[in-house]
Amino acid sequence: AFWQEARRAVEQVRPDAIWLGESVHLAHIQAFRSMGFYAASDTELFTAFDILYPYDLWPLYEGVTEGRLPLSRWFDAVDYQEVSFDSCYNKLRCLENHDTRRAADRFPEEKKLLAWTALNYFMKGTVLLYAGEEICVKHTPSLFEKEPIDWNGGRDISAYLAKLATIKKQLPTDELFRISADDAQGIVTASYTGPAAHAVGVFPLAGKGG
């Protein structure tokens, strides 16, 4: 396939490059295939790419965070990825990106924003912070106009993010990852379990508790 050939060619001139792929929503794959066009699933792309964007499940993330779907709808799908992909799969974990709603706008309550941010770091994969997320920027910048970030214009949570990054580096991420949601309480429990280590995180995504 093209991407495998491309990777082998790049390896000759740029060894050990990290390949990040931006896959598409499941609905887009279905639409393309229904018209007779090729569209790669995440499973196919992982044969060439090291990390993939979380866009396969992004509509579910938007649904649960906007109150249109129960929490479990998204987290059950995330949990299934642990057995549908190779055990060493690496998903990009983010709450926002250049063409999506800002996390600070999506979660205006501080406790919710901090809980979702902590969960994002705990989940299996590589964390993406988008420009200004460190200071809780709510405005989504234009893709076509220059809009410098006012680094003094928001609440600085960079120390909190640094602490989460330190914790993430200590997690046994090579072990089995599981995640589940309690819809009634708005709580998500995530864990890494294996013969060598175990770690559990409990996240009050509804903004209740500490």
Q: Which residues are covered by each model-predicted region?
A:
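Alpha-helix capping/termination and helix-coil
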Residues: 102, 124, 168-172
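Carbohydrate-binding surface patches
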Residues: 181-210
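Short secondary-structure junctions
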Residues: 172-182
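Short, solvent-exposed helix-loop connector elements
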Residues: 101-107
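Short acidic/histidine-rich active-site segments
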Residues: 128-135
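Active-site-proximal helices and loops of the catalytic beta/alpha 8
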Residues: 1-86, 91, 108, 119, ...
